[in-house]
């Protein structure tokens, strides 16, 4: 019997609260230890979900069967497939962050490059899919550059006040020594809005205390959903039962191959046994009442049909309840149009849209921290005007998109028309490029019409509303001559 059937249900990770008056400006080590103790009660859940993703399922922890019995341990890694498919579909295309102020937009782009932010985002998405939530942690390096990294909820937690606003009072990043004389002892850091304190072996180290440059807790929680439930957590029991059934099916196949041959009503000598094994033939004769002799294999009743039905139903339920499409299913091959494919991915898209709202909220909080440093951004409130654009990573029917955009000509604005095309990443930049090319074409046409009369060409273009210089018209003419 699988351990999942005997497991006491655990609680989902709710926020930790405190009375801010009891904590004061900084928590004591005793208070921190108490919250670490509460946090460690959640580690069992985190470790179980992590082991599912890594492929170490309960089937491998079942008691061994007798040596003479087949004992296959087969595990299908649905959790990893579900997680990686969801992450690739929803966030394989990096989140695009933009701002109306070009200087701010350039600074954000530099921050993303320095931190390989698309990879950090993907790690946070993966952690949220596994554990239900995760943390983005900001810090300043030796060059006073802002860095960001992804933390799992196994190593970091935050404690909030018990007011309606639920402000963060302090956070703890901790671990335990794994080797040496201090094996098992706690070490880490305590973060408050004003201070960062370090501790080791159960005591705070005063000489390492430093001011918190951010003025607030420099970490932001990312949530897959409001209850912090992992993506494959609702189907963990189904997955364990699927593994158990598949393993028993493998055992049945082995048992069938090793079935015992029973000879009833006749005596078989040793030399005859060898002959039967080598020639795979049974021929009994010269025995009294030979007609009553019976030769047959001893096998247990086959439940192959029942097992197959159960496996098929479990597989359908796993994808259905996890709300992640099985893209390897044969039915996906018939989804030739974009609309048909979108319908098949409808449930997954709903989960992605819900998660997108949570991500946008977390990103805005994170960039609020980032904007608090004048070296990053000249405006502390620049995060309010940031725009976060999410795009699903899905095969596109470019001909279908182009036909739709062409048919929409005259019904919608040019910008909206261009936004219908997935291969146009920035409609505004594309419109600017189109306008620039149009002006260049008309400049060349004007010069050609006036036989090289630059002054006349400039006058015509200015009358048409274009701002061009004599030099630009001459350069365009020289390019045309060179091409000829």
Predicted regions and their residues:
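Extended, regular secondary-structure scaffolds
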Residues: 122-125, 129-228
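C-terminal helix-loop subdomains that flank or include functional centers
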Residues: 274, 278-289, 306, 313-484
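Extended, helix-rich architectural segments
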Residues: 1-147, 478-484
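Extended, charged amphipathic alpha-helical segments
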Residues: 205-340
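A short, surface-exposed helix-loop junction/capping segment
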Residues: 105-108, 294-296, 345
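Short secondary-structure junctions and interdomain/linker hinges
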Residues: 43, 89, 93, 114-119, ...
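Short amphipathic alpha-helical segments
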Residues: 100-104, 112-120, 128, 234, ...
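Conserved aromatic-histidine-acidic binding/catalytic patches
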Residues: 70, 92, 96, 124, ...
């Amino acid at each position: 019997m699988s351990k999942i059937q005997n497991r006491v249900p655990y609680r989902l990770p709710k926020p930790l609260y405190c009375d801010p008056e009891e904590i004061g400006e900084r928590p004591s080590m005793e208070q921190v230890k108490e919250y670490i103790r509460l946090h460690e009660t959640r580690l069992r859940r985190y470790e179980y979900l992590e082991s599912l993703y890594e492929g170490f399922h309960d089937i491998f922890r079942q008691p061994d069967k007798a040596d003479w019995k087949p004992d296959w341990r087969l595990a299908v890694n649905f959790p990893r497939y579900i997680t990686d498919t969801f992450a690739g579909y929803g966030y394989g295309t990096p989140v695009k962050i933009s701002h109306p102020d070009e200087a701010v937009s350039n600074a954000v782009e530099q921050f993303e490059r320095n931190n390989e932010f698309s990879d950090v985002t993907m790690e946070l998405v993966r952690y949220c899919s596994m554990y239900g939530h995760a943390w983005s942690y900001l810090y300043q390096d030796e060059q006073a550059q802002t860095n960001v990294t992804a933390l799992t909820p196994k190593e970091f937690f935050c404690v909030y006040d018990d007011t309606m606003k639920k402000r963060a009072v302090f956070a703890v990043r901790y671990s335990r020594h794994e080797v040496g004389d201090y094996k098992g002892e706690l070490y880490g850091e305590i973060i408050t809005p004003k201070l960062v304190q370090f501790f080791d072996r159960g005591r705070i180290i005063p000489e390492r205390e430093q001011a918190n440059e951010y003025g607030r807790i420099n970490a932001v929680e990312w949530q897959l959903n409001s209850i912090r439930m992992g993506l494959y957590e609702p189907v963990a029991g189904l997955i364990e039962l699927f593994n158990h059934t598949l393993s028993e099916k493998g055992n049945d196949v082995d048992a069938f191959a090793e079935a015992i041959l029973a000879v009833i009503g006749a005596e078989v000598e040793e030399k005859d046994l060898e002959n039967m094994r080598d020639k795979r033939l049974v021929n009994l004769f010269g025995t009294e009442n030979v007609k009553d002799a019976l030769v047959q294999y001893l096998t247990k009743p086959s439940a192959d049909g029942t097992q197959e039905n159960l496996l098929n139903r479990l597989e359908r339920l796993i994808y259905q309840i996890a709300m992640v499409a099985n893209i390897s299913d044969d039915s996906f091959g018939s989804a030739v149009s974009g609309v048909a494919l979108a319908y098949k991915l409808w449930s997954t898209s709903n989960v992605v849209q819900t998660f997108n709202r949570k991500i946008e909220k977390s990103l805005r909080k994170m960039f609020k921290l980032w904007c608090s440093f004048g070296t990053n951004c000249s405006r502390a409130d620049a995060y309010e005007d940031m725009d976060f654009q999410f795009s699903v990573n899905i095969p596109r029917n470019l001909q279908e998109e182009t036909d739709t955009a062409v048919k929409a000509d005259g019904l919608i604005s040019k910008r909206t028309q261009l936004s219908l095309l997935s291969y146009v990443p920035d409609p505004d930049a594309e419109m600017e490029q189109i306008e620039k090319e149009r002006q260049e074409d008309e400049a060349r046409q004007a010069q050609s019409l006036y036989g090289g009369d630059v002054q006349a060409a400039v006058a015509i273009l200015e009358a048409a509303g274009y701002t061009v210089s004599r030099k630009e018209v001459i350069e365009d003419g020289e390019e045309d001559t060179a091409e000829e």
